[in-house]
Amino acid sequence: MGSRHHLYPHGTGGFLYLVAIIDWYSRYVLSWRLSNTLDADFCVEALEEALRKGRPDIFNTDQGSQFTGEAFTGLLRQHGVRISMDGKGRYSDNLFIERLWRTVKYEEVYLKAYQNGRDARVGIGDYFRFYNAQRPHQALGYRTPAQVFISIPMEATHGGMVESLTVDTMTTNYLRTAEPSLNIASILSK
């Protein structure tokens, strides 16, 4: 699901925008970027990183200009990914992303007084590493996103495709391929 999320780094007087790409099934954050502008570049960079970790069958996002522009949609088409977009103003079409944003805000952003963009980038990066590797989820049977992401069996796929993935600016939907060449150790070290 693609939706912009505004983060106010106290002390800078400006807004920062966060995009994240997550696996719906495991809630694993595959990639994320922070920007002080709403241009598409930071969203495309996050998508490029996520695509290096696997190719989804379907990518679902909202209709924000970052996600409807040629740079973003062209990259998806280039990789043979089908594009799906939610209805305008339909935040409930991607509850997993909305839940991620709530969690990030209440467990990280609102508790910190970022002095600048660098502080926000470091804090959010640390939080996503914690979120993936250490934060259990009730919906995942009290396992972490990393535990579930790594344990997705090939038998659970159809045609080599895992059942789900998502991305959003604060996240956009993304389905990934379970490729044998996928190096889980390199994903967890990011």
Where are these regions (language model features)?
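Charged DNA-binding/catalytic regions of mobile-element recombinases
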Residues: M1-K190
